[in-house]
Every structure is written in C-alpha cells, then in structure tokens.
C-alpha cells in the first residue's frame, strides 16, 4: 500500500497536531452553538415542537420524547445532529476523545513506546483507516444520511480496540516470566480489552433487530475479531505470570499454539468479511478490486503461517532427534537467547546448552550456535532453496501474409525477472524490511534501528546484516572505535571481570608520548576456576584487540613493535 507507507513515514499528520486542531474546531463550534441558542430564544421552542412531533425516536428506541424535549441538553444534541456541518464536528471530537484515551492508556501501561513500535503501530493505524473508509463506502452507500453516524461511532470503537490490541501484542513478544512487575499493568489492560469486546458483542445482540442481516453479520465479524484478539492477550498475560514460571517449556509450547491458532482464525474471519463486502458491493468497481486484493493478502498470510509451522515442526523434530536433553549442573546458568534459567536444555555438539524453543527459533533464522557461531546441521539448509533463475515465457509467431505484406516468423522470449538484466536484485518492500528488522532486533536489541535499517536496505537480507554485526562491519565495533577508548575499555573489563590464579602478563608500550596497559590471557591461567562466560569474554576481548591491531588505525602501534 503505497499511500499507507507514504503517510506512515511522513511526520504529518501527527497525533499532537490532530488533537490541537480538533480542540480548536470543537471550541469554535461550541461557542457558535451556545451563542445561537442565547441570541435566538424562539429556536428552543421550535426544536421542542419538532422533537414532540418526531415519532421515530419513541417508536425505535422507546424514548419518552415528552419528558426529554424540554431539556436544553437534549435540544442542543438534536440541533447538532440535524446540522450537516456540526455533525461532522461532533464525530471528529469523538475521534479526538478516543485518541486522547488511547494515548493515556499507552502512557500509563507502557510509559514510552520504542521507535520501531511507534512506526509499526502508525502504519497499522493508517491501514485500518483506509480499510474503514472503503468499508463505509460499501455499507453506507445505499443508505440515508442519518445512518452515517452510528457506523462512524462503531468504526471509532473498533479502531480504539485494535490499536491497543496491536501494541499490546507487540509488547507481549518481549514479556518474560521473570519480569512480573511490568506485566501487572498489561494484565489490567488485557482485562479491560476483554470486557469491552464482550460488551460490544452484547450490544450488537441487543440491537440486531434494528438491522438487516448483511450489516449485522459484518458487525459480528468485528466483534469476533475483537474477542479473539482480547482472549489471546488475556491468555498470554496469564501464561507469562510467575504462576507458570516453574515450567517454561510448557509455557512456550502453549504460547506458540495459542498464537498460531489465533492468527489463523483472525485471518480467516477477515477473509470472510472481505468476501461478504465483495459479494454485496454495488457492482464491479475499484472497491471490488480492493477487496479481492485483501482477500489474496489474507490467504497468503494463512499459507505462510502454515508453511512456517511446518518448518518449525521439522526443526523441532531435528532438535529432539539430534541433540540430547540434559539437566543444567549449575542452577544459576542462563540461556543466552532468552536469559532465563537453563534448567532442562539441549546440548549442541560444541557443548553449549539452550532451551528447546529458543534453539528452534534460532535455527529457523541461522544454522549456527548462538554463542560461538559454530556451524551446526539444520533442516533449514535443505528447506532454503535458491530462487529459480531463467523462468521465461516463449511466444512463437509462424508468420503469414496480409494483402501484399509478408510477416516473417519470429520467437519472442519474455523473462520472468528483469533484475539480473539491470544488474541488481529486486529491492525488498517495507513489510519485508520490517520483518527482517524484527529478526535482527531480537538478536541485537541494543543496536540502533536506523543502523540496522540502513544495512538491511543495502544487503537486502537479515542473515547478511546479522553477519555484518557479528563480524564488526557495522554497529559498536572495535574497528570503528578510537584507539584510546578501545584500549581503556578493554583494560577495565579485563581487570574488573577476569581474575586468574597466576599473574597476568602486562604489556606496556614504549615511552612515545603515551602509555597503555592491558591484560592479556596467560597460557598457564587456571581456566577451571572461571565460568564459561568469563572465558569466552576474555577470548572475545583478545580477538577484537587483535583485529584492531591489524587495522589501519593501529599503524602507529605496529610501528612501535606492538603486534599482539
């Protein structure tokens, strides 16, 4: 969606500017209405007579018009709803109130959103707004004007719920059973979303006799989506609590199946909703193409989820078959993927241990050990097939004559992919870039989003960006740091965190204006007294020091005779 990507990347319209403009318009409209009522007393009597003669409100909703027609508030509401301009001001004020409530709830629950979460939420919100506009063009098209406002109110409630649900689902991906302090607010928010979804369903069941069956089915589709998503959030909060932290493998298994079933059911409901809108749209027009396109998107999402599930199943079977399940000897050791206590884990050939599900998610992205980057066999190597090159369509014309003109026979071959012809591959879309960005951020949360996105646009692959980070070509790296900062930091880390039985070898530079001292691993150090993490950290420090000394920035050190 080019329009959605353009709006989501631009700084306008921002929420602050929209709220300021809405407050200004609401103040001007309120002053105008109250001035009109004060300057024209006969207007109140006219509206009162009009309300008493309006039998539609009393018959449809059972309101006591005789008692309500004398109240000034009810008269002002009727005056606003009867005016074409003021009714849109009222609807816009309603949307502004929902936006303020959404921001307050997000502020109280999550405090501040990450930049990536804000961008993804902004793009999802604009997608929902575009879908709602097309949705209303089909639903409200053949109906009268007084039916517009209920549909707009319903669309605002659905947008309010879907935005909170989307942000909560994004945050729940990073919730761990170890952090129970921040998850309490998310639990209260999940209960609020669940009860609002149930209230929406109850409200539609009460007023469905005022609607025909086609709009009622569409409203029930919205209710089902809200209920399924709220139920998913509620169960995720329950499973992430400390009550079930004693069995993390069962919790991960439950969360995986819960997310898979919820996503599949929600995509199916959305596809059925688009199919109904396509069936009852007024003729074949652009909206029909729009609904067909989104039906194809939802179908592709469902097939991708099933394909991803089959791949995960193969990887999990490979893990259970190839790597033994062991009990961690040290109760304080943690998995380097999720940073939870190891407990029962899987041991790789390089002797590193990880949880079953952590190892499965890792092998789905990379066929190497998360700690030492040692290559390990994975079924993903067989699943990943190189893209077929050379797919083409061949058109054959046998020739012929038209009057006195003779056309020779020729063959036209059209290639399916013009990327190699122009010397470059197809650039990834924004959706693919966001997916790859999430994969890289799961492994390197400390990295800046801008740095990762810049490298992804150049490499076009999450695997290439991960290798660039690990090999030090981007990010906070030794080869990009000044010499003084690097030496001082490595000296502090070596002296504070690594202790050896024997004295460490101290290397000093000659007296040429500066003097540096750093700690180096001794060949006779007692590694048995150090933890595995400390040993690997010391090796990593030596590796990066060696890389720095081999770089161009260390030419002055090599000239002094310092080569290791």
From Swiss-Prot:
CDD domains: CUE_AMFR (cd14421)
Domain called CUE: residue spans: 432-474
Pfam families given in the database record: CUE, zf-RING_2
Transmembrane segments: 17-37, 61-81, 86-106, 123-143, 148-168, 185-205, 215-235, 272-292
InterPro entries, alphabetized: CUE, Znf_RING, Znf_RING/FYVE/PHD
Known role: Proposed to have a role in neuroprotection.
Protein name: E3 ubiquitin-protein ligase hrd-like protein 1
